[in-house]
């Protein structure tokens, strides 16, 4: 009865006849993006003395003319403009000086500061009252040092720092894709990877619209053009990232059979969805594989090509043809690998491949001995194994080795330690289908977040695991200003129908004090980049018994207040199905017009029990910003997100916002509302 009365009272309070505008409180920092507390990747030797170098009179000084120094200046100027709306000009009464140890004065400065810059990617960084100095052992080191300096920028100036840094792993590779969405995504991913100090990119290139594919009728319309592939390679180089095209061969070769072409080259003649090619048919190489590799070399100008060669026998029969069965899998695999290796080597290009088919238990005693020892072998392991023994085993067999990690918590971190112990490098992979580039932000954002965690581990395997990787990823992919946005927090107390704490089974979702949201607290609080007035939950009806009697609609009267944007702190009570509409916000203006913001599960809103980063959780979106994570009393990880809605009519007053539920299992819950800008 108590629960029923509470929502009836809330309904009366917001009925058209009785509705009074909800109280608001002006705040000068309704939205405030804070600079990072510590650079990522974490430097291996760093001190941060108290103090800040003021921005007034600060200018840029480059010592040398290497391209990397120009890239460093570009990135630093972009940081000043994006974060503070300021121009970093040349000169100044004090300088941000960027150069290398080849300059005697800078070398002396590093020595006098008792810092060091060692190795091809090492740098020293000093910020004190006299200025800021980034000195690389090489121009490459200076460029990497500037990526650290960017993260010391605050609205007040550059934080004091004393850093001597160099990577533990010499190869730090991030994975990109070429599809029809390439430009919009890769133009963000490439600067992001550079800022995280990756030094190479593995570029999935199967479905590039190669000339030979277009003339043969097997070019996929979802693939990127050759011009786009070339542009991405050039862009990567301009950010210090060496491009490594990945052309999957032997297995995963559906690209060459698109449109039912080249079916005579199938390994398995009975396959309806060909997966591998016939290594004994010369036309496989003459018609398809060699022409594609030749074009890839022309486009990417690579030092190395990754030829795939993984999961060769996972689907179709292999060998499937009589002549192949007579020779056996091992000979077919070795002959194909050596053929591709020799083709690439003749053009001064190295070879990289995955480990699993060539180093499996069934063939490892014999097959690797037949392969050229300068093939780079990437050991992929996406689970809980630390990878130490497999990496050491591949290294002991004479091959340069890399680890390859994916998205699960601690996977990149564990494997990076193993790679460091084995003297290898690391690849951070991404697997979302060949034409799924946008999902790195919207749909499988957990794979994007993993780039941040991996970068930290690849540079400094001994660094602690990052706890704020989702927020860092969001900011790197979509950088924002450090300048505060004024606004107004809205008190929801008059319309709240559930308490956050559940002492007796009548609050939150009715499961008692061990499974409630008491950890969120009450009052005016900053959650992520936003400030909210927390006073209870506006919960809507859903299928579950605990919420089946709640209202389907709750209206929040705003009395004609204006805003440039609205920030909704929200969640659902229970999980739902991805991309299914579970509710909406209806915004009504004082002129009588209306706008609707849909709430698709997993995209705009998500269950409080599924925060980004929880093991096993997937299909995340960054459309809504991760804002808060905590734990229930029984130890369950929980979290909330913020959906920032841009107002298309900022000059018109908002009469009300109505939260509407579709009545499904995932019932929308509003916990905070803040008006950004406006009045």
Indicate residue ranges for each PLM-predicted region.
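Positively charged n-region of N-terminal signal peptides that target proteins for export
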Residues: 1-4
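Bacterial N-terminal signal peptides
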Residues: 6-16
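Acidic, contiguous N-terminal accessory segments
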Residues: 19-164, 353-363, 373, 477-482, ...
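Substrate-binding groove of N-acetylhexosamine-processing glycoside hydrolases
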Residues: 39-42, 48, 118-121, 125, ...
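Feature activates predominantly on carbohydrate-active enzymes
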Residues: 79, 118-332, 339, 343, ...
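An acidic- and aromatic-residue-enriched active-site/binding cleft used to recognize and process polar
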Residues: 179, 206-208, 248-250, 310-312, ...
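Flexible loop/turn segments at secondary-structure boundaries
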Residues: 181-183, 193, 208-212, 250-254, ...
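N-terminal/edge-of-domain interface segments
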Residues: 474-679
């Amino acid at each position: 009865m108590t629960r029923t009365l509470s929502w009836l009272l809330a309904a009366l309070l917001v009925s058209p006849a009785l509705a009074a505008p909800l109280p608001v409180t002006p705040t000068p920092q309704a939205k405030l993006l804070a600079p990072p507390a510590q650079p990522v990747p974490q430097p291996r030797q760093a001190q941060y003395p108290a103090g800040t170098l003021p921005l007034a009179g600060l200018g840029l000084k480059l010592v040398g003319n290497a391209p990397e120094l120009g890239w460093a200046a570009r990135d630093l100027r972009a940081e000043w403009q994006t974060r503070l709306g300021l121009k970093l000009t040349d000169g100044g009464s004090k300088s941000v000086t960027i150069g290398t140890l080849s300059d005697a004065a800078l070398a002396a400065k590093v020595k006098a500061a008792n810092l060091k810059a060692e190795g091809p990617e090492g740098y020293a960084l000093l910020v004190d009252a006299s200025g800021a100095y980034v000195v690389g052992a090489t121009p490459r080191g200076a460029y990497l040092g500037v990526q650290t300096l960017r993260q010391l920028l605050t609205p007040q100036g550059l934080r004091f720092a004393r850093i001597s840094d160099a990577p533990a792993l010499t190869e730090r590779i991030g994975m990109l894709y070429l599809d029809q969405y390439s430009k919009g995504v890769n133009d963000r991913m490439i600067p992001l990877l550079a800022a995280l100090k990756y030094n190479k990119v593995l570029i999935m290139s199967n479905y590039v619209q190669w000339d030979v594919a277009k003339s043969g009728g097997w070019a996929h319309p979802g693939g990127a053009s050759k011009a786009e592939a070339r542009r991405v390679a050039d862009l990567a180089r301009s950010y210090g990232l060496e491009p490594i095209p990945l052309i999957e061969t032997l297995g995963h070769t559906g690209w060459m059979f698109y449109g039912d072409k080249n079916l005579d080259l199938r390994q398995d003649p009975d396959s309806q969805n060909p997966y591998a090619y016939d290594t004994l048919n010369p036309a496989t190489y003459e018609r398809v594989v060699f022409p594609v590799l030749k074009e890839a070399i022309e486009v990417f100008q690579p030092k190395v090509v990754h030829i795939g060669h993984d999961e060769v026998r996972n689907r179709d029969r292999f060998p499937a043809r009589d002549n192949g069965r007579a020779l056996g899998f091992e000979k077919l695999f070795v002959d194909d690998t050596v053929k591709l290796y020799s083709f690439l080597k003749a053009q001064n290009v190295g070879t990289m491949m995955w480990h699993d088919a060539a180093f499996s238990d069934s063939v490892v005693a014999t097959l690797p001995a037949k392969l050229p020892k300068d093939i780079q072998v990437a050991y992929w392991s996406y689970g809980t194994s630390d990878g130490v023994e497999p990496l050491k085993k591949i290294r002991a067999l004479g091959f340069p080795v890399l680890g390859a990690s994916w998205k699960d918590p601690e996977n990149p971190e564990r494997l990076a330690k193993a790679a460091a112990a084995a003297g290898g490098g690391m690849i951070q992979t991404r697997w979302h289908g060949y034409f799924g580039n946008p999902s790195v932000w919207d749909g499988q954002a957990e794979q994007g977040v993993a780039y941040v965690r991996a970068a930290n581990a690849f540079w400094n395997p001994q660094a602690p695991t990052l706890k704020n990787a989702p927020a860092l990823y969001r900011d790197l992919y979509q950088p924002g200003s450090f300048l505060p946005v004024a606004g107004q927090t809205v008190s929801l107390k008059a319309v709240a129908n559930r308490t956050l704490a559940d002492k007796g089974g009548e609050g939150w979702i009715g499961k008692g004090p061990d499974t409630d949201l008491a950890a969120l607290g009450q009052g005016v609080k900053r959650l992520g980049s936003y400030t909210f007035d927390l006073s209870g939950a506006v919960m809507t009806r859903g299928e579950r018994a605990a919420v089946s009697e709640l209202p389907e609609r709750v209206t929040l009267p705003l009395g004609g207040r204006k805003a440039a944007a609205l920030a909704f702190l929200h969640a659902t009570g229970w999980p739902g199905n991805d991309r299914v509409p579970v509710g909406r916000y209806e915004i009504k203006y004082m002129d009588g017009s209306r706008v609707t913001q849909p709430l698709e599960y997993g995209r705009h809103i998500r269950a409080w029990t599924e925060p980004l980063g929880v093991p096993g959780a997937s299909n995340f979106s960054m459309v809504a910003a991760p804002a808060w994570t905590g734990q229930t009393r029984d130890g369950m990880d929980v979290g909330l997100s913020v959906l920032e809605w841009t107002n298309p009519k900022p000059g018109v007053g908002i009469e009300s916002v109505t939260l509407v539920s579709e009545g499904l299992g995932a019932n929308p819950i509003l916990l905070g509302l803040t008006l950004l800008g406006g009045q």
